């Protein structure tokens, strides 16, 4: 699916953008990363009932911004908060495998901190799982089909075991 927001991700530094006449591209990409962060926070707050995060929460943000930008915002967040034990080791490993835009400014500030998601880390970890799963399914539709096909026999077997125990 094509994202609604088609602003390309800009991977170079602001200094590089300035030297090459691409400063507006840098700024637009950076502002879009911040908007993506805000929309992730908003989606989580609308779809988390205090105990459960709706299964389609990540899908709506991915539809808006696409896999590349959502991955960048989420990975930057986990990398920035890598000390936090509420992020799973799997999500941490994934986050450190994602190529991020250069964030260091000439003054030494990391501009990526502007798009660090501030939602509760345990809930955000669930959102990251959802996003990663949705991205995999979009990249390889067979994954979704296999998951559904594997789940049906397992559910039937569990139901059969429960029925047998009741006898």
Q: Can you say where each PLM-predicted feature lies in the sequence?
A:
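Gram-negative host-targeted secretion-system effectors, predominantly Type III and Type IV
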Residues: 1-166
């Amino acid at each position: 699916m094509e994202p609604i927001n088609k602003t390309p991700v800009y991977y170079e530094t602001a200094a590089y953008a300035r030297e090459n006449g691409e400063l507006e591209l840098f700024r637009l990409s950076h502002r879009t990363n911040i908007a993506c962060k805000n929309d992730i926070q908003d989606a989580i707050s609308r779809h988390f009932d205090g105990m459960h995060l709706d299964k389609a929460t990540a899908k709506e943000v991915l539809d808006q911004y696409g896999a590349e930008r959502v991955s960048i915002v989420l990975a930057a967040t986990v990398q920035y908060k890598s000390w936090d034990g509420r992020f799973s080791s799997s999500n941490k490993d994934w986050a450190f495998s994602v190529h991020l835009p250069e964030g260091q400014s000439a003054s030494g500030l990391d501009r990526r901190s502007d798009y660090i998601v501030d939602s509760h880390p345990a809930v955000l970890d669930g959102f990251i799982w959802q996003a990663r799963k949705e991205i995999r399914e979009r990249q390889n539709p067979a994954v979704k089909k296999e998951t559904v096909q594997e789940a049906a026999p397992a559910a039937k077997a569990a139901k059969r075991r429960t029925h047998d125990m009741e006898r």
